[in-house]
Amino acid sequence: LINYKNMLHQHPLKLFNLLPVGSNISTWWNFGSMLLACLMIQTVTGFFLAIHYTANINLAFSSIIHITRDVPYGWIMQNTHAIGASMFFMCIYTHIARGLYYGSYLNKEVWLSGTTLLIVLMRTAFFGYVLPWGQMSFWAATVITNLLTAIPYLGNTLTTWLWGGFSINDPTLTRFFALHFILPFIIISLSSIHIILLHNEGSSNPLGTNSDID
């Protein structure tokens, strides 16, 4: 029998390739790995898109057209980034559903770190959604950020602060782009914490069988 705890204390990188779990888990446990693949794809494609993107209300839409038409393989990067975002959320909701079904929420540290990840991911997705700054994204930014005005006393002040003025304008797009660029690095950090916390104890045992048979 392998003593995983001793091995984990030998080198911190062992946390990423040694998970004390037997063959009694199902295919539903693949979605965590798929999420890491999505995160890697989004980070790489997002970096190349950011190189050519212009965070200006007069040039943002034109820069997207420039990326898809003029930049070599830019259309692949743009489409992969857009479709990858949808795949990201499909995987994460399946990942959450599996956790709810099999009672993974009982592992509180892992579950709370995952919940934090979801909140940061949703914020990142929203900031990214408005970046093309076409008619739809401009409207979405106005409608969704206006929800802050529902907060008693502080609503109007918070909305004005987020917009960078009395209406959505160039400062809004600039800060949305800055936030969309920096938040993925926070997601990567939180993902590392999530993985370390998970590998510290191992996965749950949905079938209730002996996990030492391997």
From Swiss-Prot:
PROSITE patterns: CYTB_NTER (PS51002). Its cofactor is heme b. Binds 2 heme b groups non-covalently. It comes from the Eukaryota. The keyword Mitochondrion applies. GO terms for cellular component: mitochondrial inner membrane. Coiled coil: none annotated. A ubiquinone binds at residue 199. It is found in: Mitochondrion inner membrane. Keywords: Electron transport, Heme, Iron, Membrane, Metal-binding, Mitochondrion, Mitochondrion inner membrane, Respiratory chain, Transmembrane, Transmembrane helix, Transport, Ubiquinone. Pfam families: Cytochrome_B (PF00033). The keyword Metal-binding applies. The cytochrome bc1 complex contains 3 respiratory subunits (MT-CYB, CYC1 and UQCRFS1), 2 core proteins (UQCRC1 and UQCRC2) and probably 6 low-molecular weight proteins. This is Cytochrome b. It comes from Cerastes cerastes (Horned desert viper). The lineage of its organism: Eukaryota, Metazoa, Chordata, Craniata, Vertebrata. The gene is MT-CYB.
